[in-house]
Amino acid sequence: HLGWWLQKSVGMNNRHAAINMTYTRKTKDQMAARVAQDIPEGAYVNLGIGMPTQVANHLPAGLEIILHSENGLLGMGPFPKEGKQDPDLINAGKQTITLLDGASIFDSAMSFGMIRAQKVDLTILGAMEVSEHGDIANWKIPGKMVKGMGGAMDLVASAKNIIVAMQQVNKAGQSKLMEKCELPLTGVKCVKKIVTELGVYEIADGGGFKLLETAPGVSIEHIKKATAGWLIVDENVKEMSL
């Protein structure tokens, strides 16, 4: 396992130094399209605030997938076209949405009752940091004012499966895939998979970011430089299909 150790060591040294990457970043829309490929037929799915909400526009045709929002919606459709927005229909991120036939609207108490009763099969969240053991930090930066943690803590404690969709490095050029989260945690050992503009990863048994797919045009060397935690690479890595 010497090769794995070396990859971990290189990544750790990059955490507090800006990473100068030369690849073209994939858009949030493209990441959302890749996440949508992992949603199974019949799943009840919560879409977190931010980029995860874009997944609604990329669900596979012909599959019945029920989207949930913690402000009290079940059965969301794609975003409305320009000029067709209804200001009374919004998701938890205050974005205008559409409702599919048979959709339901209810209060937050019922919505969180669904979450805590583990009726949600999959949650897709953004994050500021994810650790190599599947810990997630996505609600607070010390010293900055926040309104509250929102529904993320309930979701990570109750959802059966959690996928994180996020940029792999922050605005300072520092990796967000870490050995250990430095920001206040939202949940511990709960993340199963991560999709970034560089690739797709799963949390390996025993810890580590197992690289499953690389984004088109992105090399494994680039990914190593942008990963601060333990990166596991084997011969089965393939290119992401978008």
Where do the model's predicted regions map?
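Conserved phosphate- and dinucleotide-binding cores of soluble alpha/beta proteins
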Residues: H1, L6, N20-Q30, K81-L242
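Intrinsic-disorder-associated, low-complexity terminal segments enriched in Asp/Asn/His/Tyr and depleted
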Residues: H1, N13-N14
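Generic alpha-helical structural signal
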Residues: L6-Q7, N13
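Acidic, Ala/Val/Gly-enriched low-complexity intrinsically disordered segments
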Residues: V10, A17-A18
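N-terminal active-site beta-alpha-beta segment that forms phosphate/nucleotide-binding
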Residues: I19-L100
